[in-house]
A protein has these predicted regions:
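Bacterial Sec-dependent N-terminal signal peptides
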Residues: 1-29
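Periodic aromatic/glycine/histidine/acidic cluster detector
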Residues: 19-107, 111-120, 125-130, 137-144, ...
């Protein structure tokens, strides 16, 4: 379902997760501090269990490289993806039927390094925060800021008007800022009636439809 992504988010987005993180955020000397931590022992245990299960199903699968990631459903019904590399742990989680997921990246000691939210099919959204190893906030980015002129709520109304099935796996929504610093929304979906894809590009400054066409793929 997810082109995972993203993103989606970083080259490291072959990631991992355990249970929902426990966190506390305080402000100290005008600096935000986050004490969210990942239980690294539990994360390592999860990855090992997944590795052992895969080895039973596919003997020799990890002879060349050991398992570094794991996917499971937690007690709250979230699908969790957990991954470890030389610099830290990546954890994402999302729930069936939801359009958005949570992103966390942790230092090797378990302290949180980056937090954010993402749309399951293509883009990061909301407030993303980066912390140093002591939990001090060093960067905060509003991913939605360039698209305030034509927001997600406007996109939802547009999709409803066009009768686009947002939950169809062939439907994708992306957004980007071009080299001229102009923000755009990009929507594509499959019309089963005519067996073709529709592509729409919308200027996020004013909602003007720049492109509305059919592409045969």
């Amino acid at each position: 379902m997810v082109k995972l992504f993203l993103i989606i988010a970083s080259a490291f987005f072959t990631a991992c997760v355990s249970r929902a993180p426990q966190k506390a955020i305080t402000k100290k000397k005008n600096r935000m501090t986050c004490f969210e931590r990942l239980d690294t022992a539990e994360a390592n245990k999860r990855i090992l269990e997944c590795s052992e299960k895969e080895e039973m199903e596919f003997p020799g699968i990890h002879l060349i490289e050991p398992a570094t990631d794991c996917e499971f459903v937690d007690s709250m019904g979230y699908t969790v993806y957990l991954c470890k590399n030389d610099s830290g742990y990546l954890k994402t989680r999302w729930k069936a039927g939801n359009l958005f997921g949570e992103y966390r990246y942790y230092f090797l000691n378990g302290n949180v390094q980056e937090t954010g939210e993402y749309f399951l099919r293509e883009f990061n959204c909301g407030i993303w925060r980066e912390y140093d190893i002591d939990g001090n906030l060093i960067k905060e980015t509003d991913m939605d800021k360039p698209y305030k002129g034509y927001s997600w709520q406007n996109i939802m109304l547009f999709i409803k008007k066009r009768n686009i099935d947002l939950y169809d796996e062939e439907t994708n929504i992306d957004r980007y800022v071009d080299e001229s610093n102009v923000p755009y929304w990009y929507i594509t979906w499959f019309d089963r009636g005519i067996k073709a894809f529709h592509d729409i590009i919308i200027d996020a400054r004013n909602g003007y439809v720049v492109k509305d066409g059919i592409s045969h793929r």
